[in-house]
Amino acid sequence: MTKSELIERIVTHQGLLSSKDVELAIKTMLEQMSQCLATGDRIEIRGFGSFSLHYRAPRVGRNPKTGQSVSLDGKFVPHFKPGKELRDRVNEEEEGEL
């Protein structure tokens, strides 16, 4: 699902909200979450999951075109850990499809 598809779904389910209002709310929420992670903070949405940063250590990679070894610096990458309610819901729906 893309951001625009999410906006359309919310507008469809919540008839009182305009598309522009939903778009602004989602953009604001995502911007705030990005800023929070950029400062090293953790985000927890109970029942859904948590977002945090994990450190990826420096390593030697490979250029896929040339096969040449390349030194990659260490960096922080965003990480999502689903909450129990989300995991349970996904598993219930998955079992229903089988």
From Swiss-Prot:
GO annotation, biological process? DNA recombination; regulation of DNA-templated transcription; regulation of translation
Keyword Cytoplasm in annotation:
no
Q: Show the Gene3D superfamilies listed in the entry.
A: IHF-like DNA-binding proteins
Q: Which SMART domains match?
A: BHL
Cellular compartments per GO CC = chromosome; cytosol
Task: Answer whether the UniProt record assigns the keyword Ribosomal protein to this protein.
Answer: no
Superkingdom of origin organism: Bacteria
- InterPro entries per UniProt: Hist_DNA-bd, Histone-like_DNA-bd_CS, IHF-like_DNA-bd_dom_sf, IHF_beta
One Gene Ontology term of the molecular function aspect: DNA binding
Q: Which UniProt keywords apply?
A: DNA recombination, DNA-binding, Transcription, Transcription regulation, Translation regulation
Subunit field text: Heterodimer of an alpha and a beta chain.
Entries under HAMAP family matching the protein: IHF_beta
Q: What does this protein do?
A: This protein is one of the two subunits of integration host factor, a specific DNA-binding protein that functions in genetic recombination as well as in transcriptional and translational control.
Family stated for the protein in its record = Belongs to the bacterial histone-like protein family.
Q: Please give the name of this protein.
A: Integration host factor subunit beta
Source species: Pseudomonas fluorescens (strain Pf0-1)
Give the source lineage, highest ranks first. Answer: Bacteria, Pseudomonadati, Pseudomonadota, Gammaproteobacteria, Pseudomonadales
